From Swiss-Prot:
Is required not only for elongation of protein synthesis but also for the initiation of all mRNA translation through initiator tRNA(fMet) aminoacylation. Binds 1 zinc ion per subunit. It comes from Methanosarcina barkeri (strain Fusaro / DSM 804). Pfam families: Anticodon_3, tRNA-synt_1g, tRNA_bind. The gene is metG. The keyword Ligase applies. Zn(2+) binds at C147, C150, C159, C163. ATP binds at K333. One of its GO terms (molecular function) is methionine-tRNA ligase activity. A motif ('HIGH' region) lies at residues 16-26. It catalyses: tRNA(Met) + L-methionine + ATP = L-methionyl-tRNA(Met) + AMP + diphosphate. This is Methionine--tRNA ligase. HAMAP family: Met_tRNA_synth_type1.
Length: 710
């Protein structure tokens, strides 16, 4: 493989929008970027890793109005939240600023003025959505209507629910004010445009020949350029944001000042580190952007055109991730299909390294990632626990008990070759942003270690020849050292623990990959090892699944009650993975949902209902399920020769003895499922109000078991 570049490299992440909490979808960008930056450092590269909160745009103004606070107060809360969450997950930026920092205001004005001076920005009178009732112009998120391209419901600047195209002010059909729900009209006003169309030829060449990264980003962007580019309105009618030069009534569009944040945050880092930001943005340093796939257009078209026009360096690579599903369902906060990083994962005591491993090893970075608590359990138990953790613990415990230090020995050629092979494969995979391949290669080395340990049977060898056993343990401990270095980018906290137990000097996080082949020093004192990874038990996973189920039920109940808008969450104007903006509400009170937006389930044919075997059952026995705080095992008579065993999550609402003798409603032909190891042959039906009330369904008259519901 070619020698790595000696150029300094800047790694950035799409900015999280300071308008809501961190969820699993966010981490598809930030964790792989952190892994990549750590890996580059282990190759000896000069790496700077920056990010920050995206703090401007209409969604923040809307939400601040709803909460009765200023936009600045709102973003301060969420900026702190993201900063703390990233650190808890082991994601450490060299600078983590905000787009409202003075550095970003100054850099944005510098670039915009430069574009004006070079003739790339011009004024144009256009039609802007205006609400006569609210007496205000309606930029972006303040207006909704029909997309002129596909007819789907869209917001003012993007068809986020349909074709995904960027929309210019005035393009939206049948505009409606999202503040009051009334019809909007178009009025003329002067705004400013960037001559994006003049960069078509440049972008075609840049995307085809110069831009690295993932092929999905390049191909999407090339497709848009081939369709033809139109000039881009870069001003908005807002008070919150970076003021457009010479026009205090206008701010620059959030997609202008947000990516410029990359430069501003580099400046902030340089000022603290006594280094140069220009080595990236004015010279030939490498710039690698990690983004969610839904913001490819902005990073591969708008952004490089602006940079080229203002005489700044353009990105070297854009790495776009695939989307995220939750339990095989489309990610949707409004539908409850979401996993919150804080309240769902970290607050329940799950180690950050487990989630980092899952995100890196589940699938290729460009493919869709499904987050499932069961798959998490399987991957952690069968891979981290049974392979990597097993090898490290058994090796270090045996060595500690029998030697107390690194025994004398030499690195065997076979072991050296396996380490060299793993290093080569990991570096190559990282260079291609194939994090799963890198993890698979690293795990193969751990598997080799287990095989090596097992085949030499040190527990027998030590009884016959302690020196020969020491040679085996020396090689096992050297493999452990190599694994600490190779896995550090993925599971940094756990590997740091193992590194210290091996008695290694120096900071694991700054030690290079090359050190994996430096011989261990015999006589180095070992510490008693800890179990690095423990199995995720069924009851913990079932608890999380129940939390997820209750969230979905609550969302369904909210919509059924007419409190939801029935729409998929929209991509906020920020740069991070999809953020849902709250429906606009009039200051001082909640807006009433429009009737046409209430969601109902689709109509079904009678034949669909007839497929359900729903019967009355009599509860004969009910008892708690061991290892679960929520489940009850129920024996029920439903008119068959034998009783049915059901498992119901009702412990929080009924004592088992309360159910005995009751007539209940049972779905009898539901496929069997195991819960906490207990088989459930059907489902006992219950109702909930989306809050704290849950009620088992029971007939109001005595009726024999087995009676069918028709």
């Amino acid at each position: 493989m070619p020698e790595p570049s000696s150029k300094p490299v800047l790694v950035t992440c799409g900015l999280p929008y300071a308008n809501g909490k961190a969820h699993i979808g966010h981490l598809r960008t930030y964790v792989p970027a952190d892994i990549y930056a750590r890996s580059l450092r282990k190759e000896g590269r000069d790496v700077t890793f920056v990010c920050g909160s995206d703090t401007h745009g209409t969604p923040i103004v809307v939400n601040a109005e709803e909460l009765g606070i200023t936009p600045k107060e709102l973003v301060e809360v969420y900026h702190k939240h993201f900063d703390e969450t990233f650190k808890q997950l082991g994601v450490y930026f060299d600078a983590f600023g905000t787009t409202d920092d003075p550095e970003n205001h100054n850099r944005t004005l510098d670039i915009v003025n430069r574009l004006i001076e070079k003739g790339y920005v011009y004024p144009k009178t256009i039609e802007i959505a205006y609400c006569p009732k609210c007496n205000r112009f309606l930029p972006d998120r303040y207006v909704e209507g029909s997309c002129p391209h596909c007819g789907e419901i869209a917001r003012g600047d993007e068809c986020d629910q349909g074709c995904g195209k960027h929309l210019e002010p005035g393009e939206l059909l049948n505009p409606v004010c999202t503040i009051c729900g009334g019809p909007a009209e178009y009025r003329q006003q002067e705004h400013f445009f960037f001559k994006l169309s003049e960069f078509s030829d440049y972008l075609m060449d840049y995307l085809s020949n110069d831009l690295g990264g993932t092929i999905n980003a390049r191909n999407y962007a090339l497709g848009w350029v081939k369709q033809g580019l139109t000039d881009w309105c870069i001003t908005r009618n807002l008070e919150w944001g970076v003021k457009f030069p010479g026009h205090d009534d206008l701010v620059v569009y959030v997609w202008v000042d947000a990516p410029i944040g990359y430069i501003a945050f580099t400046e902030e880092w340089a000022a603290k580190a006594g280094d140069s930001w220009e080595k990236f943005w004015k010279n030939d340093g490498e710039i690698v952007h990690f983004i969610g796939g839904d913001i490819t257009y902005h990073h591969c078209i708008f952004w490089p055109a602006m940079l080229k026009g203002a005489d700044y360096s353009v990105p070297t690579a854009v790495v776009a991730s695939g989307m995220v599903k939750i339990e095989d369902k489309k990610f949707s906060k409004s539908r409850g299909n979401v996993v919150w990083v804080g309240e769902d994962y970290l607050s329940h005591g799950f180690h950050p390294d487990l989630l980092r491993y899952y995100l890196a090893s589940y699938t290729s970075h460009t493919k869709e990632l499904n987050f499932s608590w069961r798959v998490l359990q399987e991957k952690i138990n069968t891979e981290l626990v049974s392979v990597l953790g097993n090898f490290l613990y058994r090796t270090m415990l045996f060595a500690f008990k029998n030697y107390g230090e690194v025994p004398s020995g030499e690195l065997e050629p076979e072991v050296r070759e396996e380490i060299e092979k793993a290093l080569k494969e990991v570096k190559a995979a990282m260079a291609e942003y194939e994090f799963k391949k890198a993890v698979d290669s690293a795990m193969s080395l751990a598997s080799f270690g287990n095989t090596y340990f097992q085949s030499h049977e040190p527990w027998n060898l030590i009884k016959q020849d302690k020196a020969a056993c020491g040679q085996v343990l020396y090689n096992c401990l050297h493999l452990a050292k190599a694994l600490c270095l190779i896995f550090e980018p993925v599971t940094p906290g756990s590997m740091e623990t193992a590194w210290k137990e091996l008695g290694q000097e120096g900071d694991l996080h700054t030690t290079l990959y090359a050190d994996a082949l430096v011989p261990l020093k015999a006589g180095t004192k070992l510490a008693k090892p800890k179990i690095l990874f423990t199995k995720l038990e069924d009851d913990r996973i079932e608890e999380m699944e129940e939390i997820a189920n209750q969230r979905v039920k609550a969302a369904d109940a909210k919509k059924a009650a007419g409190k939801g808008n029935g729409k998929e969450p929209t991509k906020a104007e920020g740069m991070g993975p999809a953020e849902e903006a709250k429906p606009a509400e009039k200051a001082g009170g909640a807006a009433k949902p429009r009737e046409e937006e209430k969601e109902t389930l689709p109509m079904i044919e009678y034949e669909d209902f007839a497929k359900l075997d729903i019967r009355v059952g009599k509860v004969l026995l009910a008892e708690p399920v061991k290892k679960s705080k929520k489940l009850i095992r129920i024996e029920v008579d439903i008119g068959e020769e034998k009783t049915r065993q059901l498992v119901a999550g009702l412990s929080s609402y009924y004592a088992p003895e309360e159910l005995v003798g009751k007539s209940v409603i049972v779905l009898a032909n539901l496929k069997p499922a195991k819960l906490c190891g207990v088989k459930s042959n059907g489902m006992m039906l219950a109702a909930d109000d989306g809050g704290e009330i849950v009620s088992a369904l029971m007939p109001d008259k005595e009726i024999k078991p087995g009676s069918r519901i028709r």
